[in-house]
A protein has these predicted regions:
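Catalytic cores of alpha/beta
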Residues: 50-59, 105, 115-131, 189-200
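Core AdoMet radical
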Residues: 4-99, 105-109, 115, 137-144
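Amphipathic, soluble alpha/beta structural segments
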Residues: 11-14, 28, 32, 41-43, ...
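Generic structural signal for well-ordered alpha-helices
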Residues: 1, 28-32, 54, 93-96, ...
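Generic structural "secondary-structure junction" signal
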Residues: 82, 114-115, 150, 206
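Auxiliary Fe-S-binding modules of radical SAM enzymes
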Residues: 123, 134-256
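Alpha-helix N-cap and loop-to-helix initiation/capping positions
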Residues: 23, 27, 83-91, 117-124, ...
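Alpha-helical structural signal in soluble globular domains
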Residues: 30-38, 56-60, 98, 102, ...
């Protein structure tokens, strides 16, 4: 984390898989405590938890929780998740609300566009965020816009959406919820990301390395979870934002 912070980043996202056995709450909490030494904002993208767990992680320094419903169609969801805790649709659906009750100042939502009819899932995602905002007006809402992309060991192009359709979704989110955050990941190509920050996006990742140990110089090749299309460094992303006539902001959260 020290190495990442030296790049100039002030926010970090801590990720785990879906197994509490491999990454229990205490382990994630220790990671948050370490991250708090180097970063202003700590986001979590981990398996769904109970409110008490989120309260503990908040005390450890976490600020923000993102969970992807993947698809909002219960029938399609059950086809894709045959076992394990992840198969429980309602528990995953109410994750953001439990995180808010646990003290988190913000939550993120997203469907994996392409698993089902992307327009229906995008509509459901927007409605989910809108209803949460109505119920918890002081909580920051944000949308992520992942779509099916190549993954290690897998090859599938069914229901994949193109950039034009993805931009349609992003613009719909912006019109529907003008003050929500919109995040665009490094899995999208640089040209697309450079354009979308001028239109609707509020946050983009930079200097991403998805391999284990990638920032330490001891990366285990072949362990990457997925491929990225925009491999630019933090300095390169910073310059691209300025060249677009925009102001790069490493963190917009002020502690008082």
């Amino acid at each position: 984390m020290k190495r990442i912070s030296e790049s100039g980043l002030e926010e970090i996202l801590i990720l785990t898989g879906e197994s509490p056995k491999e990454s229990d709450v205490k382990y994630i909490g220790e990671a948050c405590k370490i991250a708090k030494k180097y970063f202003r904002v700590i986001g979590l993208e981990v398996y769904p938890m109970n409110s008490s767990d989120y309260a503990y992680l908040y005390e450890c320094g976490a600020d923000f929780v993102t969970v992807f419903q993947e698809t909002y169609d219960p029938d399609r969801y059950s086809q894709l998740h045959l076992g394990g805790n992840k198969r429980i649709f309602p528990y995953r659906f109410y994750t953001q609300e439990r995180a808010i009750k646990g003290g988190m100042r913000g939550v993120g939502l997203g469907a994996l566009l392409g698993l089902n009819d992307f327009r229906k899932d995008a509509f459901a995602t927007g409605l989910h965020g809108y209803l949460l905002q109505r119920k918890y007006p002081k909580t920051e809402m944000a949308f992520s816009c992942p779509r099916l992309r190549p993954a290690t060991g897998k090859s599938s192009d069914y229901n994949c959406i193109n950039e034009r359709e993805l931009l349609q979704v992003i613009c719909a989110y912006r019109i529907f919820m003008p003050y929500a955050g919109i995040t665009i990941s490094s899995r999208e190509r640089s040209g697309f990301r450079d354009n979308v920050i001028k239109i609707a996006a509020t946050k983009i990742s930079a200097g991403v390395d998805v391999g284990i140990g990638g920032h330490t110089g001891k990366e285990h090749k072949g362990d990457e979870q997925f491929e990225i299309d925009d491999g630019r460094t933090v300095k390169e992303i910073y310059k691209a934002i300025k060249d677009a006539g925009l102001q790069p902001v490493m963190s917009d959260y002020i502690y008082v």
